[in-house]
């Protein structure tokens, strides 16, 4: 394979894994530990 193809595949995999981790952090198990500043603030 050419170098450009390998670099493109590597960057694509990196982007997909970062997106998957961000979705897991936002909606998965760790999301229970996130705080909501709007819920903490009382008017």
Curated annotation (Swiss-Prot):
Domain of life: Eukaryota
Topology term for the membrane: Single-pass membrane protein
Keyword terms: Chloroplast, Membrane, Plastid, Thylakoid, Transmembrane, Transmembrane helix
Subcellular localization, as worded in the UniProt entry: Plastid, Chloroplast thylakoid membrane
Subcellular location, principal: plastid
Gene Ontology cellular component terms for the protein in this record: chloroplast thylakoid membrane
GO biological process entries: photosynthesis
Claim: Glycoprotein is one of the keywords in the record: no
Membrane spanning stretches: 7-27
Keyword match Oxidoreductase: no
Function: May play a role in photosystem I and II biogenesis.
Family label: Belongs to the PsbN family.
Name of this chain's protein: Protein PsbN
Native source species: Huperzia lucidula
């Amino acid at each position: 394979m050419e170098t450009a193809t390998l670099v493109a595949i590597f960057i694509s995999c990196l982007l997909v894994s970062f997106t998957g981790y961000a979705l897991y952090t936002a909606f998965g198990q760790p999301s229970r530990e996130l705080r909501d500043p709007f819920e903490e603030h009382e008017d």
